[in-house]
């Protein structure tokens, strides 16, 4: 019963905020170059959907609010996109084309200016991420990317693709590693909510612009992945205590 009430109330609130997002989008588009207002309304939507699970941010002190980053995040659930909105940054997502077909979600991503890619064409996708990513980074907005390229089926962090790291190097911006834990355990079965579940977002120290520019991409990519693997293991160990 509680799950049903949650779904109904969350749907109503999200729909109202969705309508407000359209209004804000048209009113602020001429002067809001980073689409901060729409981003804030999306944060309210994610607070409605995920706030009940007690999202906890660890390592927020590693973020410079005035800096644009390439954010790299592990990917285990569709909720990963919603999970990091507590971070004090305006960011644009790189997301597969199929997500844009989801009612409301696709339109919201469009209003954000998120980067939609066709994973069937790797070369085209990489070019689009690079071009649009550079545009947003120059405007001062961060770009969020799942470096594994797809959702992990076993919850572990697998090999990274180089796209996010090439973008950061060419744009000369720091890389901000973020590890999310708990988004894959929000429900019991297909419908009932797991009310005891908690979501933790751990922000790791960024890779400096100097390191991104001067060090080999493969080396940076390997180091960042290992840091994220270690951080995820630590979060899981702490959760069992």
Regions found by a protein language model. Name each.
Residues 61-65, 193-194:
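A short beta-turn/loop motif at secondary-structure boundaries
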Residues 1-27, 36, 61-63, 218-241:
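Membrane-interfacial terminal anchoring regions of lipid-handling membrane enzymes
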Residues 56-57, 116, 143, 175:
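Hydrophobic beta-strand scaffold residues
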Residues 59, 71, 93-94, 201-203:
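Generic preference for hydrophobic
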Residues 127-241:
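Non-catalytic C-terminal accessory region of glycerolipid acyltransferases
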Residues 51-58, 126-127, 183-185:
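Short gly/ser/thr-rich secondary-structure transition/capping motifs
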Residues 18-39, 52, 65-122:
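Catalytic core of membrane glycerolipid acyltransferases/transacylases, capturing the structured
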